[in-house]
């Protein structure tokens, strides 16, 4: 037992009180073999005894780091002294519930990897997560991170997890690669307004049905929402605008989403990548915001799009000699009044001359 922090004061016959140093040998009744809420221990000094209660936690903490977790416990509440949870601390454990303490700042790589965790309570003090924390946590149904101070959701945070609901904090700026890969039970998610980046395959093959994107987002990486079979709607919200000339939705971002019927492009996006909506036949209408300055090869070909509204006065640039920007059977491309001739003479757009008119 470590008696650091135990302060004992003795009252002597002369009426004075003095600090008394206590050694482990003078303590009885203590056992750390099992966690208990209250354990009575007794100090014996020169024939005098004093008893008091202590709580035995199922964890060991050294210098603020969780160093050991006793096995065989379904629920654990971490003591307030824990500042960080190290790599693989609960990996493969049979624990069902963990209450993370206020004061906890970071959680290490694979901390709960392949565990049976069902419920976890996150503190307001949490600032940093490392990768793969809830990888293969099939029993985890909800993760409420909304009160934390996280700015980044790391790569592979919830890969193959059973999460049905994830609430993200307003402080979040980045969702890293494959953060929600194959989360088949996740149905909806709202991306916080401060998020600027969604990483490679972040939501690939997830079960989401609707997504709300902030208008200030500047990077949606390749295959971010690739093959989401239940995705029906992607909408935008917010007044934040970022004037980043490289802001881009990258290639194949929404390819293979057969139920997608509505897609809104965030206002800050400047470049639309190759094969952006490939294979999506339910979408029939699309609006391209005025900030879009470039549309890459076959961005909207192989889709069900029939009507397009392009809000830019200047035609978005096309660099390919053979563009395949829209389906051959598109019925109309509406552009601003006074810009019809610009579009009809612009590279790529001239392939659709007889479809271009004003809105």
Residue ranges and their predicted role:
Residues 1-18:
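Solvent-exposed, low-complexity, repeat-rich "mucin-like" stalks and linkers
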Residues 3-7, 38-40, 330:
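Exposed beta-strand and adjacent loop surfaces of beta-rich binding modules
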Residues 8, 41-43, 64-66, 78, ...:
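Extracellular/surface recognition and adhesion modules
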Residues 16-52:
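Serine/threonine-rich, repeat-prone extracellular segments and beta-strand-based repeat modules
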Residues 54-58:
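Interdomain boundary/hinge segments at the C-termini of tandem beta-sandwich modules
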Residues 60, 70-84, 93-106, 115-128, ...:
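Structural signature of tandem-repeat unit edges
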Residues 87-89, 108-111, 131-133, 154-157, ...:
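Consensus positions within tandem repeat domains that build extended binding/scaffold surfaces
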Residues 321-324, 341-353:
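Short, aromatic/basic amphipathic alpha-helical patches
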């Amino acid at each position: 037992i470590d008696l650091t922090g135990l302060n004992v004061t003795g009252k002597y016959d002369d009426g004075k009180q003095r600090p008394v140093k206590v050694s482990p040998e003078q303590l009885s009744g203590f056992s750390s073999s099992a966690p208990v809420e209250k354990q009575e221990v007794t100090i014996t000094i020169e024939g005098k005894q004093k008893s008091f209660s202590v709580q035995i936690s199922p964890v060991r903490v050294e210098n603020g780091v969780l160093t050991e977790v006793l096995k065989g416990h379904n629920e654990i509440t971490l003591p307030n002294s824990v500042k960080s949870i190290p790599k693989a601390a609960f990996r493969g454990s049979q624990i069902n519930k963990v209450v993370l303490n206020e004061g906890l700042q970071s959680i290490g790589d694979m901390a709960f990897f392949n565990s049976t965790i069902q419920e976890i309570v996150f503190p307001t003090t949490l600032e940093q997560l490392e990768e793969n924390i809830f990888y293969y946590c099939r029993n985890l149904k909800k993760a409420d991170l909304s009160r934390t101070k996280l700015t980044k959701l790391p790569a592979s945070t919830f890969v193959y997890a059973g999460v049905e609901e994830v609430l993200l904090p307003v402080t979040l700026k980045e969702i890293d690669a494959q953060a929600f890969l194959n989360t088949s039970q996740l149905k909806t998610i709202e991306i916080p307004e401060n998020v600027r980046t969604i990483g490679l395959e972040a939501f690939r093959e997830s079960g989401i049905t609707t997504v709300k994107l902030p208008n200030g987002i500047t990077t949606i990486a390749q295959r971010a929402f690739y093959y989401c079979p239940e995705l029906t709607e992607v909408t935008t919200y917010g007044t934040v605008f970022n004037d980043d000339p490289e802001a881009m939705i990258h290639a194949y971002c929404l390819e293979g989403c057969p139920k997608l019927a509505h897609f809104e492009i965030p206002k800050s996006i400047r470049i639309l990548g190759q094969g952006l909506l490939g294979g999506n036949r339910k979408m029939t209408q699309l609006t391209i915001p005025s900030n879009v300055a470039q549309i890459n090869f076959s961005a909207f070909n192989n889709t069900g799009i029939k009507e397009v509204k392009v809000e830019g006065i200047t035609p978005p640039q096309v660099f390919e000699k053979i563009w395949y920007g829209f389906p051959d059977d598109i019925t109309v491309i509406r552009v601003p009044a006074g810009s019809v001739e610009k579009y009809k003479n612009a590279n790529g757009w001239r392939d659709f001359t007889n479809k271009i008119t004003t809105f």
